[in-house]
Curated annotation (Swiss-Prot):
It comes from Lactobacillus helveticus (strain DPC 4571). Homodimer. SUPFAM superfamilies: PRTase-like. It catalyses: AMP + diphosphate = 5-phospho-alpha-D-ribose 1-diphosphate + adenine. Keywords: Cytoplasm, Glycosyltransferase, Purine salvage, Transferase. Belongs to the purine/pyrimidine phosphoribosyltransferase family. InterPro entries: Ade_phspho_trans, PRibTrfase_dom, PRTase-like, UPRTase/APRTase. This is Adenine phosphoribosyltransferase. GO terms for biological process: adenine salvage; AMP salvage; purine ribonucleoside salvage. The lineage of its organism: Bacteria, Bacillati, Bacillota, Bacilli, Lactobacillales. Pathway: Purine metabolism; AMP biosynthesis via salvage pathway; AMP from adenine: step 1/1.
Length: 175
């Protein structure tokens, strides 16, 4: 039975800034069975892409990616905000739909040739995905797919990274 996950995603207007509609996944996370099913859907996608490792950007990418990695018996690599990792890092900057930031990964986090699937809660402008892809490739890995709970197609993230296979549970048009 297919689940319409959009029924369990809260839409919060003017958060974190006026004019933004924030898509809140916490109702899914609060329901153990829904969370398990959403995790399984993303894990099946990662399995189909023959992933060797899962990457999740801070912070909600940890919530989405860690259980996917666990279900598949794969390692998980966090892409962290600056100055959170204790060892030598690779860094890439990106723009968000409402700001800018950087991501870092330990230089030894991805092995050369590893097939990587990124998991996160939402793809909007693809800024986080683009920065993560840069990090993965700089470390010698290959981004073979990206899986999201939510995609905002009107922000044209797919168009910005046409070489990346993208999977999402829910798409919100006109958002």
């Amino acid at each position: 039975m297919a689940i319409d996950f959009s029924k369990y995603i809260a839409s919060v207007k003017d958060f974190p800034n006026k004019g933004i509609v924030f898509r809140d996944i916490t109702p899914i996370l609060q329901d153990g069975e829904l969370y398990r099913i959403a995790t399984h859907e993303l894990a099946e996608y990662a399995k189909s892409r023959k992933a060797d490792v899962i990457v999740g950007p801070e912070a909600r990418g940890f919530i989405v990616g860690c259980p996917v990695a666990t279900e598949l018996g794969l390692g998980f690599v966090p892409a962290r905000k600056p100055h959170k990792l204790p060892r030598e890092v690779e860094r890439a900057s990106y723009d968000l739909e409402y700001g800018s930031n950087s991501l870092e990964m330990h230089k030894d986090a991805i092995k050369p040739g590893q097939r990587v699937v990124l998991c996160d809660d939402l793809m909007a402008t693809a800024g986080t995905l683009r920065a993560s892809k840069e990090l993965i490739e700089n470390l010698g890995g290959k981004l073979v797919g990206a899986a999201f709970y939510i995609e905002l197609p009107d922000l044209k993230g797919r168009e910005k990274l046409p070489d990346v296979d993208i999977y999402s549970l829910v798409q919100y048009h006109g958002a």
